[in-house]
Regions:
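N-terminal beta-strand motif that seeds the catalytic metal site of vicinal oxygen chelate
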Residues: 1-28, 87-94, 147-150
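Vicinal oxygen chelate
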Residues: 2-8, 21-34, 38, 43, 53-55, 63-65, 71-133, ...
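An N-terminus-focused feature that recognizes amino-terminal "leader" regions
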Residues: 14, 33, 49-52
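Short glycine/proline-centered loop/turn elements that form peptide/ligand docking sites
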Residues: 25-26, 43-49
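Short, conserved turn/kink motifs that form compact alpha/beta structural patches or helix kinks used as
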Residues: 67-69
């Protein structure tokens, strides 16, 4: 297989951190003291049930996503519970040019996809998630989000 056969993964889109309910604003303020700027805020409903804040530092796509669960049914709330209630690293996100091609390619390669098809994400994106223990040959050990802008 050549590089031309692999759908274009462009760059890291963001790193996500799960924060406990009530900790979002103190963390946003702390990152602002370090020079980060808030560039997006949204309550993401549906499957995700989180409050999202995107922070940027410097120029370019240097984004940190803070995720606060809106309720106990949120996947982020369950992730925080599994970590002993501490919160912390949630996932990395990779930007692609064509989400459907990336989805089809990863499915063909045997990756365990957590979504049956690409779906609407926050800020007008289309996304799907890849399981941390995805194939017999590959176990990332952490969740991966694949993102297409607009």
């Amino acid at each position: 297989m050549s590089a031309a056969d692999i759908p274009g993964f462009l760059f890291f889109d963001h790193v996500a951190v799960a924060v406990r309910q009530g900790d979002l604003e103190p963390q946003v303020n702390a990152y602002k003291l370090l020079g980060f700027t808030e560039v997006h805020r949204e309550d993401v409903l549906g499957k995700d049930q989180v409050r999202e804040v995107l922070l940027q530092i410097g120029a370019g796509p240097n984004l940190l996503q803070l995720l606060e669960p809106l309720n106990a049914d949120s996947p982020v709330a369950k992730q925080i519970e599994k970590s002993g209630g501490r919160g912390g690293f949630a996932h990395i996100a990779l930007r692609v040019a064509d989400i459907q091609k990336a989805f089809d390619y990863m499915k063909e390669q045997g990756f365990k996809l957590l979504d049956p098809a690409p779906r609407k994400g926050s800020r007008g994106t289309t996304v799907f998630f890849v399981h941390p223990k995805t194939t017999e040959q590959v176990a990332f050990g952490y969740l991966i989000e694949v993102v297409q802008e607009g």
